[in-house]
UniProtKB/Swiss-Prot annotation:
Any GO molecular function: oxidoreductase activity
GO CC, alphabetical: membrane raft; plasma membrane
This protein's name: Disulfide bond formation protein D
Cystine connections: 69-72
Gene: bdbD
Biological-process GO terms, alphabetical: establishment of competence for transformation
Lineage, uppermost ranks: Bacteria, Bacillati, Bacillota, Bacilli, Bacillales
Species the sequence originates in: Bacillus subtilis (strain 168)
Domain of life per record: Bacteria
Protein family (similarity comment): Belongs to the thioredoxin family. DsbA subfamily.
Record localization: Cell membrane; Membrane raft
Chief localisation class: membrane
Residues of the Thioredoxin domain: 37-220
Keywords attached to this entry: Cell membrane, Competence, Disulfide bond, Membrane, Oxidoreductase, Redox-active center, Signal
Chain ranges passing through the membrane: none
Traits of the deletion mutant: Cells partially restore cytochrome c oxidase activity in a CcdA-deficient mutant, possibly because the bacteria can no longer oxidize the 2 heme-binding thiol groups in apocytochrome c.
């Protein structure tokens, strides 16, 4: 009887340790992907990256984002349209998106697909980009699949679904994705979304007032 009690107590201790470790891992992942970070200052290079706006716009806004990141979805649905209306459409800002892959295989698949769209049908990129974020569900699950990406390409681009799926399988555009990863490392990207206004890192991506004020200061300095 005593041995049985000891075994039960030992099992309870082990179970408690496992639960604590799992909870700690979840906290670390959440902090990495959706909270503040220590990104370095300095203007990120947008050579070869998707760009929306006039080439000679005096201010550059760059989003380091992940298509599977819930906070990135919020930024693109709530904040980005304001930037577009107030600054991009007026020729004051050009906007660029750099892939970050913090959420595993699905993040990489989405990044590969987005790179293909940018290279093969750039005029359709931002529609594809917006619709892909809209596909993100409210609950964590493996939703990014070759089938979904193929269907999205069919409805938003000139790329044939079978062509996109084949390129995903072959990782045809892996070199572009690796360039994004290299830039992430160079800028020490630790969270998504990370937003740059020229060489300034925005502290709170969801605070449009901060973003607007920073853009306006940069415009005055030009």
């Amino acid at each position: 009887m005593k041995k049985k009690q000891q075994s039960s107590a030992k099992f309870a201790v082990i179970l408690t340790v496992v639960v604590v470790v799992l909870l700690a891992a979840i906290v670390i992942i959440n902090n990495k992907t959706e909270q503040g970070n220590d990104a370095v200052s300095g203007q990120p290079s947008i050579k070869g990256q998707p760009v929306l706006g006039k080439d000679d716009a005096p201010v550059t806004v760059v989003e380091f984002g992940d298509y599977k990141c819930p906070s990135c979805k919020v930024f693109n649905s709530d904040i980005f349209p304001k930037i577009q209306k107030d600054f991009i459409d007026k020729g004051d800002v050009k906007f660029s998106f750099v892939n970050v892959m913090f959420h595993g295989k699905g993040s990489r698949l989405a990044a590969l697909a987005s790179e293909e769209v940018w290279k093969e049908d750039p005029d359709s990129f931002w529609d594809f980009h917006e619709k892909l974020f809209e596909k993100q569900p409210d609950t964590e699950q493996e939703w990014v699949t070759p089938g979904l990406l193929g269907d999205l390409a069919k409805s938003t681009t000139k790329i044939k679904p079978e062509t996109l799926k084949e390129n995903l399988d072959k990782e045809t555009f892996a070199s572009q994705v690796e360039k994004d990863s290299d830039l992430n490392q160079k800028m020490n990207i630790q969270a998504t979304p990370t937003i740059y206004v020229n060489d300034k890192v925005i502290k709170n991506f969801a605070d449009y007032d901060e973003i607007k004020e920073t853009i306006e200061k940069e415009l005055k300095g030009k």
